[in-house]
From Swiss-Prot:
The keyword Cytoplasm applies. The keyword Phosphoprotein does not apply. It is found in: Cytoplasm. Keywords: Cell cycle, Cell division, Chromosome partition, Cytoplasm. InterPro entries: ScpB_csome_segregation (IPR005234), WH-like_DNA-bd_sf (IPR036388), WH_DNA-bd_sf (IPR036390). The gene is scpB. GO terms for biological process: cell division; chromosome separation; DNA replication. Homodimer. Homodimerization may be required to stabilize the binding of ScpA to the Smc head domains. Component of a cohesin-like complex composed of ScpA, ScpB and the Smc homodimer, in which ScpA and ScpB bind to the head domain of Smc. The presence of the three proteins is required for the association of the complex with DNA. This is Segregation and condensation protein B. Belongs to the ScpB family. SUPFAM superfamilies: Winged helix' DNA-binding domain. NCBIfam families: SMC-Scp complex subunit ScpB. It comes from the Bacteria.
Amino acid sequence: MDRTEQKSIIEGLLFVSGDEGISPEQIAKVLEIEGNEVINILEEMQKECEGAHRGLQIVQYAKVYRFATKKEHASYYQKLIDIPTAASLSQAALETLAIVAYRQPITRTEMEEIRGVKTDKALQTLVSHLLIKEMGRAEGPGRPILYGTTKEFLDTFGLKTLDDLPPLSEENEQMNEADLFFGSLQEISK
């Protein structure tokens, strides 16, 4: 096995070991090479990561090596953490989101007729989470705002297009759309 392949395998081992890391001894056993050779390879890999424009570095903590992100990119990682997810949505917001997903473009009044309650707060939450947006205005008195889902909605729920939404069969149309939608999403993600 050549050095390039050894580095490739070590890189994979570092990845699968996650935050716990992996010791040079463990790597040596897997690759069936000497421990000091593993340390030499790890040091080479550390230098390669430092010199390259890469987002990861190899660090050593408490006799184990692991991948870590670079400190200079911390502000970007914080932005990702700050992006709200569907898990942080209330039941009312999830129900409203399911209605918008299946019935878009749809007005607030139409959503309230389906849900039987006001949707103002849920709509504000969904817009602030970038899951829905204003799609235009309906014809008719007052020209109410039409809502639809966004690209972020598709990304959040692992959908490529709206066509990937689980279909509503005639018998399921009587079910709560939120229950059907999120139950079907669980099936997709298995």
